[in-house]
UniProtKB/Swiss-Prot annotation:
Residues 2-362 form the Glutamine amidotransferase type-2 domain. InterPro entries: GATase_2_dom, Glu_synth_lsu_1, Ntn_hydrolases_N. Keywords: Glutamine amidotransferase. The keyword Metal-binding does not apply. It comes from Methanocaldococcus jannaschii (strain ATCC 43067 / DSM 2661 / JAL-1 / JCM 10045 / NBRC 100440) (Methanococcus jannaschii). The keyword Nucleotidyltransferase does not apply. This is Uncharacterized protein MJ1351.1. The active site is at C2 (for gatase activity).
Length: 362
């Protein structure tokens, strides 16, 4: 159930959206037409590159204008709307129950010391308090495009082929525990974190309570939402190195920890004890993308793009990785990768619970 695909150019070459749409369409049998979505990084390279790009879905009802004003009132409390417009779409492809709107936005200078926290607060306030609107992406130079529909329908609806990005993630949904609606489609995004997920997170209740202790609010009725918030908490707010943050999500088994060298054993024990509420149980495979985030790697701080994939500790959901020149791919199935890149340099199956981490070349 569910199909995921992601790729990144480590040279940061711009790649048209028709590539990700074609790859996801080959995974459509893993979904059931009840949700598909895409996220592109680097899609706003012009004068809005340094603005937060809020993609917001607003109910397509007679209350649309009223809801839109409520959204703008929240935004204007904390900063300036530089530009806003309806996201271009094609008519007659899917039922347009939501109107996708985007705001290019600058946070007020008085919040400069906590700018990203303010953006998170805005997202939580809109999703929690405004009936009929929800934020689907809120990062810089990126955008999420999702809806109820098959992969090719959603791609045509949003004109994905008109966008170019250096990294793309996409998802074909097969909902099992919640109803199909636009907000429940993947990817899930917060700031520069974007998550696509195949499987079921049976620990959702525990994970939800854990992030809510830190002010996050889960309102989109699906387990994947909480993963984006956990990543933001661990890596942005708590500044935990990416490998150790992912170890909190899929920690080593206790018998493995017992066999580690002392320093490593103490570290993994501390992660399990301090971040037990972040541990994901159940069968899952996730792919995550983020640019411009502070990622601690081997003691060094990098401010650049990172894409990674991760499965549960016994790999109950598939995840395939591949490389070709500067390109790296992550997918549920090798066939989706070969649909857009038939001649690969390397293909491998990541070990259970072990991440694949891709960074741009320098």
């Amino acid at each position: 159930m569910c199909g995921i695909i992601g790729f990144m150019s480590r040279k940061k070459r711009m790649i048209k959206g028709d590539k990700i749409a074609l790859a996801l369409d080959s995974l459509k049998e893993r979904g059931n037409g009840k949700g598909s979505g895409y996220v592109g990084y680097g899609i706003y390279p012009t004068k809005y590159k340094d603005c937060y790009a809020f993609h917001i879905l607003i109910d397509n009802t007679p209350k649309f204008e009223k809801i839109k004003v409520e959204v703008e009132n929240v935004l204007e409390q904390y900063g300036t709307i530089v530009k806003d417009e309806e996201i271009p779409t094609e008519d007659g492809i899917i039922e347009k129950t939501q109107i996708p709107w985007r705001y290019f936005y600058e946070v007020d200078e008085k919040f400069a010391d906590r700018e990203e926290d303010v953006v998170v607060d805005i997202v939580m306030e809109i999703n929690d308090k405004i009936d009929g609107a929800f934020v689907i992406s809120s990062g810089k130079d990126l955008g999420v495009f999702k809806a109820v529909g098959w992969p090719d329908e959603v791609a045509k609806f949003y004109r994905i082929d008109k966008y170019e990005g250096y990294m793309w993630l996409a998802h074909a949904r097969y909902p099992t525990n919640t109803r199909a609606w636009w907000g429940g489609a993947h990817p899930f995004n917060l700031l520069n974190w974007s998550v696509v997920h195949n499987g079921e997170i049976t620990s959702y209740g525990t994970n939800k309570r854990f992030v809510e202790m830190f002010g996050y609010k889960c309102r989109l009725l699906t387990d994947t939402e909480v993963v984006a918030y956990i990543l933001d908490l661990l890596m942005r707010k708590h500044k935990i190195p990416v490998e150790y943050a992912l170890s909190a999500l899929a920690p080593r088994f206790w018998d493995e920890i017992d066999k580690m060298p002392e320093e490593e054993r103490e570290l993994h024990t501390a992660i399990r004890l301090a971040y037990g509420g972040a541990m994901l149980n159940g069968p899952f495979a996730i792919a995550v993308g983020t640019p411009q985030g502070l990622i601690f790697m081997n003691g060094d701080i990098e401010k650049d793009t990172t894409m990674f994939g991760l499965t549960d500790r016994i790999k109950l959901r598939p995840l395939i990785a591949a490389e070709k020149d500067d390109m790296i791919f992550i997918s549920s199935e090798e066939s989706a990768i070969r649909r857009i890149c038939p001649d690969l340099d390397r293909v491998w199956m990541p070990d259970a619970g072990m991440p694949v981490i891709a960074r741009p070349w320098k």
